[in-house]
A protein has these predicted regions:
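Electrostatic cytochrome c docking/interface patches
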Residues: 1-6, 17-31, 35-36, 157, ...
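C-type cytochrome heme c attachment motif
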Residues: 6-18, 67-71, 84-93, 101-104, ...
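Extended, hydrophilic extramembrane loops/domains of integral membrane proteins
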Residues: 134-136, 142-178
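Acidic, glycine-rich loop-and-strand cores that form catalytic or ligand-binding grooves
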Residues: 86-127
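Solvent-exposed, acidic/flexible segments
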Residues: 1, 5, 81, 95, ...
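Juxtamembrane interface at the cytosolic side of transmembrane helices
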Residues: 184-210
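His/Cys-centered metal/cofactor-coordination and adjacent catalytic loops
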Residues: 17-90
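Sequence/structural segment immediately N-terminal to covalent heme-attachment motifs in c-type
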Residues: 1-18, 189-194, 198
Length: 210
């Protein structure tokens, strides 16, 4: 998940927001409290100048949410061929088999085959569009975000192939859709063990009483 976060930060965050995810949630990825604070400070968030009261920017804090890359939809559309990049917080929940969909989409860019164009001329990408075999209508406004192996350098030494980066960021975006899932799973086993123990104890007590 930390690898996927790095791909999001260095590649995806230039266009896509995570407006429902707080920077403090990075602690769920295995970062310490100090690391979360330091990582939050690498993000620039909107702020208010305490001296003038005017809008400004400041380093992020754990209590902040991931900042948006554009101030509004007009600016977002102007920078992206009139297409507004979607927020990615819940993207894997918004698609069937969302994790695999995201990973496939990121690796599905390729020129349309001659056979496809012969049968479906409308499949040719128009100006500002890119052919992707996994996109519903085969052409989308998003340029290939993962363009070369090694585009991101992983801290753990994992080779950052396009396929690996796609898999990692898809896993990260699955986490952003439910950032407390890891903690709930970790809590689940002790709870189940306690319930099982309590059930056995209750059964044993009943047999002794009756």
């Amino acid at each position: 998940l930390q690898r996927g976060y790095k791909v999001y930060k260095e590649v995806c965050s230039a266009c896509h927001s995570l407006k429902f995810v707080a920077l403090r949630n990075l602690g769920e990825l295995g970062y310490t409290e100090a690391q979360v604070k330091a990582e939050a400070a690498t993000w620039t968030v909107p702020g208010i100048d305490p001296n003038t009261g005017e809008a400004s920017t400041r380093p992020g804090e754990p209590t902040d949410y991931f900042p948006k890359p554009y101030p509004n939809n007009v600016a977002a559309a102007a920078a992206n061929n009139n297409a507004i990049p979607p927020d990615l917080s819940l993207i894997t929940k918004a698609r069937a088999d969302g994790t695999n969909y995201v990973a496939s989409l990121l690796t599905g860019y390729r020129p349309p085959s001659e056979e496809l164009l012969a049968e479906h001329p409308e499949a040719a990408p128009g100006p500002g569009l890119y052919h992707n075999v996994y996109f519903p209508n085969m052409n989308l406004a998003m340029a290939p975000p993962l363009t070369s192996n090694g585009q991101v350098t992983y801290d753990d030494g994992t080779e950052a192939t396009i396929g690996q980066m796609a898999t990692d960021v898809a896993a990260f975006l699955t986490w952003t859709a439910e950032p407390t899932l890891v903690k709930r799973k970790q809590t689940g086993w002790p709870v189940l063990i306690f319930v099982l123990f309590a059930t056995i104890l209750a059964w044993f007590s009943k047999t002794q009483i009756w």
